[in-house]
């Protein structure tokens, strides 16, 4: 799985630098993990796309290639992650397919962790469900902050 992520990160980075942010945004910002935001909040999605397109194509491309694609897999860091001693709150959208399994792994690995799976939500849960996101986070911080 991580090898595919590396390849995808390299391809995205090359595409960003070759075609620019507007072209990349037309596909990346309309991918399956971003569609719930478009459906729930078209104006919010348009703003997300606008801000995405304002980023530097070279900077975003190099970040995708040089950082995203090269960072170690969370699965390879499980031993270190298991030593996290502070309460940890993990949130994920149920339509954010690439993040579901890693989120569950984090929940199982971090001793004092909680996992919230937001229904009918993608990768932008704070933009898609701001009230629910803020309430859940606020409750966690009130208990553990």
Kindly give the residue locations of the regions a language model identified.
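Short, conserved loop/helix-junction motifs that constitute active-site signature segments
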Residues: 81-85, 108-110
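Short beta-strand/loop motif that positions the catalytic acidic residue
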Residues: 83-84, 90-92
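Hydrophobic, aromatic-rich cap/lid helix
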Residues: 46-77
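Catalytic active-site module of serine/aspartate enzymes centered on a nucleophile-bearing elbow/loop
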Residues: 112-145
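Active-site phosphate/pyrophosphate- and oxyanion-stabilizing loops and adjacent acidic/basic residues
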Residues: 78, 104-105
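Conserved alpha/beta-hydrolase "acid-adjacent" motif
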Residues: 97-102
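Flexible "cap/lid" loop of the alpha/beta hydrolase fold
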Residues: 1-28
């Amino acid at each position: 799985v991580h090898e595919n992520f590396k390849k995808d990160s390299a391809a995205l980075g090359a595409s960003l630098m070759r075609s620019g942010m507007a072209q990349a945004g037309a596909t990346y910002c309309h991918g399956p993990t971003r569609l719930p935001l478009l459906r729930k909040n078209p104006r919010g999605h348009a703003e997300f796309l606008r801000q995405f397109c304002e980023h530097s194509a070279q900077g975003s491309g190099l970040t995708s290639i040089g950082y995203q694609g090269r960072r170690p897999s969370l699965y390879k860091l499980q031993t270190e992650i298991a030593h996290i001693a502070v309460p940890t709150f993990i949130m994920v959208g149920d339509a954010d397919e690439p993040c579901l399994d890693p989120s569950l792994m984090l929940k199982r690995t971090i001793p004092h962790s909680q996992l919230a799976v937001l229904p009918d939500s993608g990768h932008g849960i704070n933009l898609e469900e701001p009230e629910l996101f803020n309430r859940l986070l606020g409750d966690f911080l009130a208990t553990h902050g």
